[in-house]
Amino acid sequence: MTKFTILLISLLFCIAHTCSASKWQHQQDSCRKQLQGVNLTPCEKHIMEKIQGRGDDDDDDDDDNHILRTMRGRINYIRRNEGKDEDEEEEGHMQKCCTEMSELRSPKCQCKALQKIMENQSEELEEKQKKKMEKELINLATMCRFGPMIQCDLSSDD
């Protein structure tokens, strides 16, 4: 009787393990399929615009900044008008990104999408920009009202 009980418990354990592994594999496959159906380009554009700015960093000392210092009023007027278009475009990228990412049904899958963006874009960035990108990706997750991203590791280990 004891051998039968042990055998039965072992059999139940194996069935439970197989079902669990099958469910996990199904979730992985489902997320992979969802990611293939989502266009991450608007997200990548939005993030790159955020981390690279629009040329108005104070530490840049190029000709445009020199012109800005010598003709401040006129250039500011032009830049304000340009900024509106760029802001609208940036807002458009963010909105398109949120729409695309809303197709991903779970926080884990959304995290994988953010990790993919990080992986795709971070190769050409300096360490400081990579850190800023991590921060902007988390901000994007908040703005798009994704699920909890607490356990989402975006750090790039290059």
UniProtKB/Swiss-Prot annotation:
Highest taxon in the source lineage: Eukaryota
Tissue: Expressed in cotyledons. Maximal expression in parenchyma cells undergoing DNA endoreduplication and cell expansion but not in actively dividing cells of the cotyledon.
Positions of short motif Cell attachment site: 54-56
GO MF annotation, one: nutrient reservoir activity
Transmembrane regions: none
Record key words, sorted: Disulfide bond, Seed storage protein, Signal, Storage protein
Signal peptide positions (record): 1-21
InterPro entries per record: Bifun_inhib/LTP/seed_sf, Bifunc_inhib/LTP/seed_store, Napin/2SS/CON
Chain positions listed as propeptide in the UniProt record: 65-81
Family from the record: Belongs to the 2S seed storage albumins family.
Function: This is a 2S seed storage protein.
Quaternary structure (record): The protein consists of two chains linked by 2 disulfide bonds.
Name of the molecule in the record: 2S seed storage albumin protein
Organism of origin: Glycine max
